[in-house]
Amino acid sequence: MKYFGERLSVLSSLLVLLLLSGCGGAEPECDSSDTRKSVVSVVSSDNHNPLVNYAAKNSSAVQAKLSNASTDAEKSEIMEQAEQRGSYALGDTISTNSKSRDRREVTCSGELSATVDDATAHKQVDFKVEKAPDGKMSVSVTPFKF
């Protein structure tokens, strides 16, 4: 009976250790809704990013407005307004490229699209999700070029 009590004590100690090891909080995830929102927010906050520029330049609606503009200032204003109208979406498939050993950082990739009027541009976007020691998550997006 003494042996059974010792085993029970050891098993309950292991159970407590397992439960406590999960208290560190969730690992960073590539495909969480917060991560997706953060990636789109980072990219959309830059009105002059190459993706929205490309979509604006390839929009027939924008091109029609540009052809009716007579001055460079008008053309510049049309392009600026078009870029500000850009809408963004992160594709359904997000890939986890790597995880750090301490499970505080993941690198990820996904397809980002920017739409301006009748034109949509797609580009792979790479980003990193990090969990700080205080448990807060941060997302950084690798700049991309066309």
Regions found by a protein language model. Name each.
Residues 1-21:
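Sec-dependent bacterial lipoprotein signal peptides
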Residues 23-146:
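Cystatin/cathelin-like cysteine-protease inhibitor module
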